[in-house]
């Protein structure tokens, strides 16, 4: 149901009111801006180092785009599918460790000792809260500026990093080059949502060329327009000007988004940037091809992706076995479409050709 506002207008023969220019509508907010580049520095408080990027912000980017989340989830799923549980490392702990390593650039496992002081199990420690200590081998659990703080014993936390060329205290995720593309994609989606919630237009200019009776009439119009804020905010308004002209009042749209729409181009280009950063075949994360030839066979793309991307990640993760001193992590054979086998052998992998 719409609301009608009636604004009375006095005798137009009176002295004309002075010209008034009034802007209305809230500025469109954005998720993040270029200031994120200012975070690339490190400092310590005497006990632990702070990361070069806020870990809370980095965690929030996990959901900035379906392409980014799907690419991360694909790698985690392939690792989890091949991981074999051991007495020291559960599937759940490994999955959380793998997700942290790929999204946050750091994966942590805590050494849980038994009564004899030997390894009972390795448990996941969240990268969001772990901070390397200033003292070598020491780590801290920090739950925000005012939250709980826990100091781990020296040698109780295993850290696996994605190397960063600027420093060696924290790892940085290699997909970071596509961060701005992901945020651009999200901003484009948020703008489009606001466009539809705004009545399918991007704002307009209320142009009034009629001579009004007095300044109070212009103020009344301004007040009624200023009340049109928020979702479902547009109201009907009756303006009666005796002897007025046909085009005395005009509503002129600022932009016709339906006619000049860059939304699809922005989404496509930002998607390509993210897929390039993740080196992920598009058919493996549900992207529909727009060409007649398609993307090729999914199985062949999966095999190539596993060999070129998943195997190097798994090799890095196998370093935990040497650190813990036990075969903590192991991977099952991966059977390729052509019958060849990618098999773990010690801390590496070997491809056994079919036949």
Regions found by a protein language model. Name each.
Residues 1-132, 169-172, 257, 294-297, ...:
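Flexible, gly/proline-biased loop segments at the beginnings
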Residues 2-12, 75, 80, 142-143, ...:
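Extended, charged amphipathic alpha-helical segments
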Residues 107-109, 137, 202-204:
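Generic beta-strand structural signal
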Residues 119, 137-140, 249:
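Hydrophobic residues embedded in beta-strands of well-ordered beta-sheets
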Residues 127-136, 140, 147:
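A short alpha->loop->secondary-structure connector
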């Amino acid at each position: 149901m719409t609301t009608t506002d009636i604004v009375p207008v006095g005798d137009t023969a009176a002295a004309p009111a002075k010209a008034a220019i009034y802007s209305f509508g809230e500025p469109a907010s954005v998720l993040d801006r270029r200031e994120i580049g200012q975070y690339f520095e490190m400092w310590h408080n005497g006990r632990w180092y702070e990361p070069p990027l806020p870990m809370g912000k980095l965690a929030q980017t996990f959901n900035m785009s379906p392409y980014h989340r799907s690419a991360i989830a694909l790698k985690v799923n392939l690792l989890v599918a091949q991981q074999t549980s051991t007495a020291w490392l559960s599937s759940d702990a490994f999955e959380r460790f793998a997700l942290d390593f790929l999204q946050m650039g750091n994966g942590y496992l805590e050494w849980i000792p038994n009564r004899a002081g030997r390894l009972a199990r390795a448990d996941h420690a969240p990268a969001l809260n772990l901070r390397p200590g200033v003292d070598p081998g020491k780590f801290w659990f920090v739950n925000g500026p005012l939250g709980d703080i826990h100091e781990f014993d020296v040698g109780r936390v295993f850290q696996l990093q994605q190397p960063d060329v600027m420093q060696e205290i924290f790892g940085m995720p290699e997909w970071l080059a596509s961060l701005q593309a992901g945020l651009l994609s999200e901003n484009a989606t948020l703008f489009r949502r606001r466009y539809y919630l705004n009545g399918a237009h991007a704002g307009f200019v209320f142009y009034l060329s009629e001579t009004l009776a007095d300044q109070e009439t212009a103020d009344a119009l301004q007040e009624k327009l200023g009340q049109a804020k928020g979702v479902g905010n547009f109201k009907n308004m009756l303006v009666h000007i005796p002897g007025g002209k046909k085009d005395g009042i005009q509503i002129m749209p600022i932009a016709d988004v339906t006619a000049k729409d860059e939304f699809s181009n922005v989404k496509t280009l930002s998607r390509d940037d993210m897929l390039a950063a993740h080196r992920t075949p598009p058919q493996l994360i549900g992207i529909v091809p727009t060409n007649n030839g398609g993307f090729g066979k999914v199985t062949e793309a999966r095999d190539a992706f596993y060999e070129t991307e998943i195997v190097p990640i798994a090799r890095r993760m196998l370093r935990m076995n040497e650190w813990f001193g036990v075969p903590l992590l192991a991977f099952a054979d991966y059977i390729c479409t052509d019958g060849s086998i990618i098999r773990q052998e010690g801390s590496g992998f070997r491809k056994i050709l079919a036949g």
